[in-house]
Amino acid sequence: MNIIAGFQNNFSEGLYTKFKSYRYRVFVEYLGWELNCPNNEETRIQFDKVDTAYVVAQDRESNIIGCARLLPTTQPYLLGEIFPQLLNGMPIPCSPEIWELSRFSAVDFSKPPSSSSQAVSSPISIAILQEAINFAREQGAKQLITTSPLGVERLLRAAGFRAHRAGPPMMIDGYSMFACLIDV
């Protein structure tokens, strides 16, 4: 497995195109999210900017098998703009020391998991998360914040990551979701 972390301009055009197609396949086709995606790939959407950071995992054949997006909370980000209610009245983080981790996926389409918990706890997902933490730390982050399904909390702790809730879980679109802080 090869994992690359960097800003969009650090990726070749070919890899970035494969990455957008992978995200479309995961989030639109596999998870059923309703996103405006022409040409069966995710184009730059609300939080994808030139200075957005990504983590991309590839297998030995260079197929993408996982990804994540990283944004400093000093610019608009998913939790702060779309799901602030998950913070339970806490001020929306806005600090170069807190980065948002979003669009996290660890789906290897050559052998998809039988459950979402397997996808989150797989060696691929642990490696992607560790690389995201390392990259964010290099940028000066001390914490990551995510919008996550509740089961992720238990899996993060089981994998040895220091994580805690930023607010109580809430039902969003039929899922028990929470804001999770992960120490970097």
From Swiss-Prot:
It holds the Pfam family Autoind_synth. Its EC number is 2.3.1.184. Gene3D superfamilies: 3.40.630.30. Disruption phenotype: Mutant fails to produce any detectable AHL signals and is impaired in biofilm development. It catalyses: a fatty acyl-[ACP] + S-adenosyl-L-methionine = an N-acyl-L-homoserine lactone + S-methyl-5'-thioadenosine + holo-[ACP] + H(+). Keywords: Autoinducer synthesis, Quorum sensing, S-adenosyl-L-methionine, Transferase. Involved in the synthesis of the acyl-homoserine lactone (AHL) signal N-(3-hydroxydodecanoyl)-L-HSL (3-hydroxy-C(12)-HSL or OH-dDHL). Required for normal biofilm development. This is Acyl-homoserine-lactone synthase. The lineage of its organism: Bacteria, Pseudomonadati, Pseudomonadota, Gammaproteobacteria, Moraxellales.
